[in-house]
From Swiss-Prot:
GO terms for biological process: proton motive force-driven plasma membrane ATP synthesis. Keywords: ATP synthesis, Cell inner membrane, Cell membrane, CF(1), Hydrogen ion transport, Ion transport, Membrane, Transport. One of its GO terms (molecular function) is ATP binding. One of its GO terms (cellular component) is proton-transporting ATP synthase complex. InterPro entries: ATP_synth_F1_ATPase_gsu, ATP_synth_F1_gsu. It is found in: Cell inner membrane. Belongs to the ATPase gamma chain family. HAMAP family: ATP_synth_gamma_bact. Its main location: membrane. F-type ATPases have 2 components, CF(1) - the catalytic core - and CF(0) - the membrane proton channel. CF(1) has five subunits: alpha(3), beta(3), gamma(1), delta(1), epsilon(1). CF(0) has three main subunits: a, b and c. It comes from the Bacteria. It is a peripheral membrane protein. This is ATP synthase gamma chain.
Amino acid sequence: MESLKDIRDNIKSVQSTQQVMVTMKMISSARIKKAQNAMLNARPFSLGLEGVIDDLRKDILDENNSFKDPDLSKFFKKPDMEKKNIGVLFITADKGLAGAFNALLLRAALNFIKENQDKNIYFFIIGKKGRDFLSRLKQPNVHIVYDAVGIFPKVGYVHADILGEEIINNFLKLDLCEVRVLYNDFKSMGSQKLENQRLIPFDFEIAQGHTEFGEEEHGFLFEPGKEMIFKLLLYRHIKAGLYRILLESQAAELAARMNAMDSASKNAGEIIDTLKVKLNKVRQSSITNEITEIVGAVEALNK
């Protein structure tokens, strides 16, 4: 049977752990409000830019419905799955203690690798958990071309800008059939959804009707030229989409950690209650034994 000291030490240890969990929950709760605001503020810009790009695209396509710059056409063609090179943006957390947040992503990445054994997979990794996992795999067809850690929970557009440059340059240089993105999307405080989406080339023609320019001619003068402006805006659109994805992943991670710490804190409370009951039982048993010994000693003296 455990001694009273052992049980008291266990209670103190669990209480200390519970306090850490409560603190982590409070930190995540405070940060997620900022993350949600940043996420909501990023969406209108991305949608507005989408409409402007669509208007320009219709203006610069030639009679064959193609661009003068062959690189631009690659962003709108259907993926040629006969190509042997494919890219994946893989977004995980830097730390654990976030429930199944990382485990689901790592399993999805492993399944993706198994399903594409015949391809060279070029990974763009955000997050220490993903980088460490893929580095340990040592698969001959898995190549890490870019990784960044420590950007969460303070994601800025500069991170999306750097990431976007890497993805765009390697998409063209390595002749990737497509670039997909694996990440957890924020749905609500209690729900995050694992996403496996195509980033580029675009799944569909850029949506119409999001811009005030409409169909009529407004007589705008473009310098240094429509196609150059279109290319700059297209790259900016990709980076804006990446920024939104990073913000979504950040919010999902914070929500998952907050829920995990809340659950762990409640479990710690239940363990403490159980230990306190056990402590009382041991104390009562100890007192009973002492009383029995005293009574026995008194009876022995009276004989």
